[in-house]
Structure formats: structure tokens, C-alpha cells
């Protein structure tokens, strides 16, 4: 159910950027207030990313007011902060469907709107995309402008600096807006800096600056003195030296919540030549006190009533797999001070908060730099430490070369705790953990484990900790564990050995991971054998051979892409053993998995017990 737009009289007049640009500038502050209120209420109805969007309301209004979108290109980095953008670009009445099945995509998405010029989900991509669009605009002589909006958190990723280095060299016209919400706005980032930014972006300053360069072109000594003087004067009031060194003209910082100042500064910058940086200071969660005080806790929210100023109380329930990992990490760190925990900016999501607090000298946050996080683990392993890299499946993709070249090639004992393996749900195709078993299985020297419940997860983590002949990975899903009885003792599992969970006849289901419960349910109707394979690599050769010899049909089950996954490993083994056998592979199809609740996606892909049974019966009927 959408909100009553009559409660937002100015926002009602700005359903698209064209309508927004018809408004008098004097109404923009009221528009920003209404947009923020609309965002509060709509996310409360739908759930979703919350605090980031509250901090970009004024910026979003100003960008669409000054730039001729979608002709002018606007690229959002990651997209957590793009909810206001969606509201102002014709999707206002569908905001209550965001992140839901058949609803709006959680991030900017090209297929969804012409205003979403680049599909995003992983951080650090906006500058590269914007540079390409700026080069294309110049080649086509289109006269269009290009703007990328990137947060200070994404600036920790190396790809951003690679792109900036290239942009500074090519010198195409483009604007990079640095949305800095690391700290609250201080007195120095008020009227004085807003005035300074407008002066520095104005025609007079730019003309004098460029004319001086031409005059001094033939006098290198004087030119260098002038350059240093300019840097010294600017350095006293703006922290832009790094950007200037990379070839960008730096302007700011300015108050990112002063919509009039943003409009005037952006108007001035719109005509500037070459790559530009506008540094704005914002407050994540702006306008909603609980989110301002705890922007991390309010980064994303379930459905809630904003008027209550608190999120709904969570009912006591099963621990998540992330929490199971976090507890194990603390337990093992108590025993071994050489255990080091590494995360690429996912402390909360990966369950490492307690570990970071109790063992601060053993905790390393590599920031949004997955390549660095993986090789950091490799370096620690070289020196005799026990590195544990906690990383989401979708983000491990970004450190793939390092996994191969820096870890596996050297047989270094780095343990990868891979969270969010399989179906993630509402965040959609950019965040589903669909490919990790496939891209790890082909790497020599890797040991890959897939626990069926929280106890196996704990024992497998300990197995990886004890394994010193090379890298190992334990891959587990998002969300609550299965409810298995907790076993505190830690025992290393025999490498490459599975266990039979149910003896049947005719059909043997070889299960990899937490789909075991559904497989056991489906097996009851079929009187099938069910095997908890535990290890994706190395496979239990003897057990697979036994199942092939004693059953008519094999069924592999995994929450990973069928192509190249665990089931493919079983087929390869059967071929090697020269044992032809009908094999049905149940897993994720050859497509990007859309957003929806995990339960909806699992059902649609026939990965629940009902779906498995239907797939097996269809296979037998052919």
C-alpha cells in the first residue's frame, strides 16, 4: 500500500526530475523535508536500507535540479543511498515494494529506469563507469555531463584510485561527488566553507586560475612557485591535496544538507572543464534521531513504525550462522593468540563485533578492500600466524586472483569463513552467493567444506584451523541456524569424508550444505538414501563410488550454481571412475537470481523439499 501523496504537497509536484526542475528554488528546502519524511514512512512500510538515504536527500534534490537527467548521466556508487533518487525518478508510488519479489530493485538498476545509468551493488565502481561515460560523451560530442556519487567508505577500495588516476590522466569533463558522512558537520564546514566553495567553483576564480597557468607556462620556476603557493593557501582550508595530485580540481568541503548551497555550487561546477571533486559533509541517518546516533545499527531496517523511534524487538530465536562463526572465533582465540581475524569492512555482518572488542590486537578490518584482505591473510600465514578471513561469498569474487595466486599457489594455511553462501534474498543478484563453490572448486590445493547445520559449521571451522597443508574454506548461509543441539567441544573432521544420514534404496541424494533438512524431507516420500557429503573438495571418493554401485540414480543437492558446482564434481568423479550413472543435479540455474525473500526464492527455484521432490519425479519420468 503506497503512502497518501497529498500529505506531501511539494513532493507531489515532483514525481520526475523534469517536474522537479519546474519548481522555484525557494521550495527546495521544503521538498527535501517532505522527501525525507516520505522516505522514513515508506521504508518503515517495506523494510530496506535506511540511514544512508536519509543522508543524501538534499544532494539528490540538488543533483536532479541542476543536471538534465537522464540525458546527463548520474551514477550512484553501491546504491544504499539511492532511495531518494528512486522516489524522485518516477518510482515514488512503488517504493513500498522495494526489495520484495517483483518489486523495485534494492539498488539502481538499468532495467528498471532510464535514470539508473549503471547497475550497482558492489562498492567502488562508479568512478570507472563515469569516466567511460565522460569519454563517450566527448567522442559523440553529446554535450552531456557525467556525475558520480561515492561515499567515503567506498574510497577505501583500490579500484576507486585506479579510476581516479586514469581520469586525471585523460582529463575528461566529469564530476565526482564525495559524500563524506564519517563525521558530523563541524563549525568549519558551514557558511565559510560554503562561501569558499562557491568562490572556488565560480567563473572568476576559474578564469584567473587557468589564465595564470597560461601566462606562467613558459616560466617553469615561477609556475612551480605559484602552484605551491596555491596549494598552501588551499591546504589551509580544504583537504584536497590528494585529489589535486591525481589530477582533479577539488572543491569543498561544504554542508551536504544545505540544498541552496549545493545547487549554487553544482551550477558553478557544471561548466568547469576536466575532472572535478565536490566534497560534501553529510550525516548518515539525518533527520531521524535514532539513526543519527547509531547509523550502523540503522543501516538497514525491518518493517517498523518510525513514530516509535525504535526498531521492533527481535524475538529470541536460533543463532545465525554468522553468530556461530563469531562465537567459534572467540573460543579459538582464547586458546591461541596466533589466531587473527580479518574482515573487509563487514565486522557486524560477519559476526565479529565481540571478537573485535575482546581481541583488538588480533582483529584487522581491511576496509572495503577484498584483494588486500585476502593477501593480508596470506602474509600472516607466511609468518606462522593463523589467519581467518571472514568474507561474504559475493565479495570473495573481488579477491579471486589473490585467492589463487597469493594463497593457494603457495599452499598457505588461510582459513576462509565464507558467509552468505547461497540464496541471500532481498538484496538480489548482486549479493546472492551463487558462485563460490564453482570458482573455488577449480583451484588446486583448496579444501572446501559445506556444513549442514551449526554444529558441523563449528567443527569444520576447527578443521580448517587445524589444517596446515594449504587453504581451506567453510561456506555457510545467511540467516538462522537449524536448531541442532550445540556441541561445545571442537573436533577436527577427517578431510574428504561424508556421512550417511538416511538409508533407502534406488535413489541416493548427495547433499552439500544446509539443504540437508529439505533433502531428508523429500527422501521420506521416495525412500531415498541421503548422504551429508560435508566436503565439496576433496570429495569422498569411496562414498560416491559406494552410492553409485548400490543405487540406480544419484541426485546432487546444493545451493550454488549447477554449472561447475559440487554436482559437477560428482559427475567428473564418476567419469574418472568409468561408472556411468543417471545423475540429477539440483541447484541454482544458469541465471542471476532475482530479489525476494529467501523462502520465496527457494520455492521458486524448487530448492525446498516440495521442489526437490518434483524435480526428482520429473527426472524419473523422462
From Swiss-Prot:
Classification via Gene3D superfamilies: 3.40.50.920, 3.40.50.970
Cofactors that this protein relies on: Mg(2+); thiamine diphosphate
Gene: dxs
Binding site residues for thiamine diphosphate: 80, 121-123, 153-154, 181, 288, 370
Family: Belongs to the transketolase family. DXPS subfamily.
GO molecular function annotations of the record: 1-deoxy-D-xylulose-5-phosphate synthase activity; magnesium ion binding; thiamine pyrophosphate binding
Entry GO CC: cytosol
Protein's name in the database: 1-deoxy-D-xylulose-5-phosphate synthase
Residues involved in Mg(2+) binding: 152, 181
Function: Catalyzes the acyloin condensation reaction between C atoms 2 and 3 of pyruvate and glyceraldehyde 3-phosphate to yield 1-deoxy-D-xylulose-5-phosphate (DXP).
Broad EC category: transferase
Summary of subunit composition and partner proteins: Homodimer.
Amino acid at each position: 500500500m503506497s503512502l497518501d501523496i497529498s500529505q506531501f504537497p511539494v513532493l507531489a509536484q515532483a514525481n520526475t526530475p523534469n517536474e522537479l526542475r519546474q519548481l522555484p528554488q525557494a521550495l527546495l528546502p521544503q521538498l527535501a523535508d517532505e522527501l525525507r519524511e516520505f522516505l522514513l514512512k515508506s521504508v518503515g512500510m517495506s523494510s530496506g536500507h535506511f540511514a544512508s538515504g536519509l543522508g543524501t536527500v538534499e544532494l539528490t534534490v540538488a543533483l536532479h535540479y541542476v543536471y538534465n537527467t537522464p540525458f546527463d548521466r548520474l551514477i550512484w556508487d553501491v546504491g544504499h543511498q539511492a532511495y531518494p533518487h528512486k522516489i524522485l525518478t518516477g518510482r515514488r508510488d512503488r517504493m513500498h515494494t522495494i526489495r520484495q519479489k517483483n518489486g523495485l530493485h534494492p539498488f539502481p538498476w538499468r532495467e528498471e529506469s532510464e535514470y539508473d545509468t549503471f547497475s550497482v551493488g558492489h562498492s567502488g565502481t562508479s568512478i570507472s563507469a563515469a569516466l567511460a561515460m565522460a569519454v563517450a560523451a566527448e567522442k559523440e560530442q553529446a554535450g552531456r555531463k557525467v556525475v558520480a556519487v561515492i561515499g567515503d567508505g567506498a574510497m577505501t577500495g583500490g579500484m576507486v584510485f585506479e579510476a581516479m588516476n586514469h581520469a586525471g590522466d585523460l582529463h575528461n569533463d566529469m564530476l565526482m561527488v564525495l559524500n563524506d558522512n564519517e563525521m558530523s558537520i563541524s563549525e568549519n564546514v558551514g557558511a565559510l566553507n560554503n562561501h569558499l566553495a562557491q568562490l572556488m567553483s565560480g567563473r572568476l576564480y576559474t578564469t584567473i586560475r587557468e589564465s595564470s597557468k597560461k601566462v606562467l607556462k613558459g616560466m617553469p620556476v615561477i609556475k612551480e612557485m605559484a602552484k605551491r603557493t596555491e596549494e598552501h593557501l588551499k591546504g589551509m582550508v580544504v583537504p584536497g591535496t590528494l585529489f589535486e595530485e591525481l589530477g582533479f580540481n577539488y572543491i569543498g568541503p561544504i554542508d551536504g544538507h544545505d540544498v541552496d548551497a549545493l545547487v549554487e555550487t553544482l551550477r558553478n561546477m557544471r561548466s568547469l572543464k576536466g575532472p572535478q571533486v565536490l566534497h560534501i559533509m553529510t550525516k548518515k541517518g539525518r533527520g531521524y534521531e535514532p539513526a543519527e546516533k547509531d547509523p550502523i545499527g540503522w543501516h538497514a531496517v525491518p518493517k517498523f513504525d518510525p513514530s516509535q523511534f525504535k526498531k521492533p524487538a527481535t524475538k529470541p530465536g536460533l543463532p545465525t550462522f554468522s553468530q556461530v562463526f563469531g562465537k567459534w572465533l572467540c573460543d579459538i582465540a582464547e586458546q591461541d593468540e596466533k589466531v587473527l581475524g580479518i574482515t573487509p569492512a563487514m565486522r557486524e555482518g560477519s559476526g565479529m563485533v565481540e571478537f573485535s572488542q575482546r581481541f583488538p590486537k588480533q582483529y584487522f578490518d581491511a576496509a572495503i578492500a577484498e584483494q588486500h584482505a585476502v593477501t593480508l591473510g596470506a602474509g600472516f600465514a607466511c609468518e606462522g600466524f593463523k589467519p581467518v578471513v571472514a568474507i561474504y561469498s559475493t565479495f570473495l569474487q573481488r579477491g579471486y586472483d589473490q585467492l589463487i595466486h597469493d594463497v593457494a599457489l603457495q599452499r598457505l594455511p588461510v582459513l576462509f569463513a565464507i558467509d552468505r553462501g547461497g540464496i541471500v534474498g532481498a538484496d538480489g543478484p548482486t549479493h546472492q552467493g551463487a558462485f563460490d563453490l564453482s570458482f573455488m572448486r577449480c583451484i588446486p590445493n583448496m579444501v572446501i567444506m559445506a556444513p549442514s547445520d551449526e554444529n558441523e559449521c563449528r567443527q569444520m571451522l576447527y578443521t580448517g584451523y587445524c589444517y596446515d597443508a594449504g587453504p581451506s574454506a567453510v561456506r555457510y548461509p545467511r540467516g538462522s541456524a537449524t536448531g541442532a543441539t550445540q556441541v561445545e567441544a571442537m573436533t577436527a573432521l577427517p578431510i574428504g569424508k561424508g556421512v550417511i544420514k538416511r538409508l533407502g534404496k534406488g535413489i541416493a541424494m548427495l547433499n552439500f550444505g544446509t539443504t540437508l533438512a529439505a533433502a531428508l524431507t523429500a527422501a521420506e516420500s521416495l525412500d531415498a538414501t541421503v548422504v551429508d557429503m560435508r566436503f565439496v573438495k576433496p570429495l569422498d571418493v569411496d562414498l560416491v563410488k559406494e552410492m553409485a554401485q548400490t543405487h540406480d540414480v544419484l541426485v546432487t543437492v546444493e545451493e550454488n550454481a549447477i554449472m561447475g558446482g559440487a554436482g559437477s564434481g560428482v559427475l567428473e568423479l564418476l567419469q574418472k571412475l568409468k561408472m556411468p550413472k543417471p545423475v540429477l543435479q539440483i541447484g541454482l540455474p544458469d541465471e542471476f537470481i532475482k530479489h525476494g525473500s529467501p523462502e520465496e526464492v527457494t520455492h521458486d527455484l524448487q530448492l525446498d523439499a516440495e521442489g526437490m521432490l518434483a524435480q526428482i519425479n520429473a527426472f524419473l519420468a523422462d
